[in-house]
């Protein structure tokens, strides 16, 4: 394929970026700007926030598990197509996937040793 065949795609991407930037710029000019403290306060079911949620930081352990889930889901996305074409790619493909899985395993072991999977503080 030549570079000229990608020219319409370049125009389309450029147009999309320009329209998005123009929309954000115009909306920032037109919207009212009236900051007040109540706007930034946490709101839950019409009740005043109390305790740690009233402005302090609190620990949410679920985000680490969510990140690990995404990482290993991406691994599975690479692993299934690799298993389908294993005979065609041969030994080199096997070694590449082994290195990929080894790197993920090292990262998982690091997270485990650092206590990222522990629920108690």
Swiss-Prot record:
UniProt GO molecular function: NADH dehydrogenase (ubiquinone) activity; NADH:ubiquinone reductase (non-electrogenic) activity; quinone binding
InterPro entries: NAD(P)H_OxRDtase_bac/plastid, NADH_UbQ/plastoQ_OxRdtase_su3, NDAH_ubi_oxred_su3_sf
Recorded topology in the membrane: Multi-pass membrane protein
Keyword Membrane tagged: yes
UniProt GO cellular component terms: NADH dehydrogenase complex; plasma membrane
Subcellular locations according to the entry: Cell inner membrane
EC number(s) from the headed UniProt entry: 7.1.1.-
Reaction(s) catalysed (UniProt annotation): a quinone + NADH + 5 H(+)(in) = a quinol + NAD(+) + 4 H(+)(out)
TM annotation in the entry: 6-26, 60-80, 89-109
Keyword field contains Translocase: yes
Domain of life: Bacteria
Keywords assigned by UniProt, alphabetized: Cell inner membrane, Cell membrane, Membrane, NAD, Plasmid, Quinone, Translocase, Transmembrane, Transmembrane helix, Transport, Ubiquinone
Known function: NDH-1 shuttles electrons from NADH, via FMN and iron-sulfur (Fe-S) centers, to quinones in the respiratory chain. The immediate electron acceptor for the enzyme in this species is believed to be ubiquinone. Couples the redox reaction to proton translocation (for every two electrons transferred, four hydrogen ions are translocated across the cytoplasmic membrane), and thus conserves the redox energy in a proton gradient.
Similarity comment text for this entry: Belongs to the complex I subunit 3 family.
Record's subunit section: NDH-1 is composed of 14 different subunits. Subunits NuoA, H, J, K, L, M, N constitute the membrane sector of the complex.
Official protein name in the record: NADH-quinone oxidoreductase subunit A 2
């Amino acid at each position: 394929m030549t570079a000229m065949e990608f020219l319409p795609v370049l125009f389309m991407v450029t147009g999309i970026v320009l329209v998005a930037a123009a929309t954000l710029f115009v909306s920032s000019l037109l919207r009212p700007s009236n900051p007040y403290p109540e706007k930034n306060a946490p709101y839950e079911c019409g009740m005043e926030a109390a305790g740690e949620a009233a402005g302090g930081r609190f620990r949410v352990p679920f985000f680490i598990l969510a990140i690990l889930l995404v990482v290993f889901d991406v691994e599975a996305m690479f692993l299934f197509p690799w298993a389908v074409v294993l005979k065609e790619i041969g030994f080199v493909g096997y070694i590449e996937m082994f290195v990929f899985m080894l790197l993920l395993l090292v990262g998982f072991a690091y997270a485990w040793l650092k206590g990222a999977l522990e629920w108690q503080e």
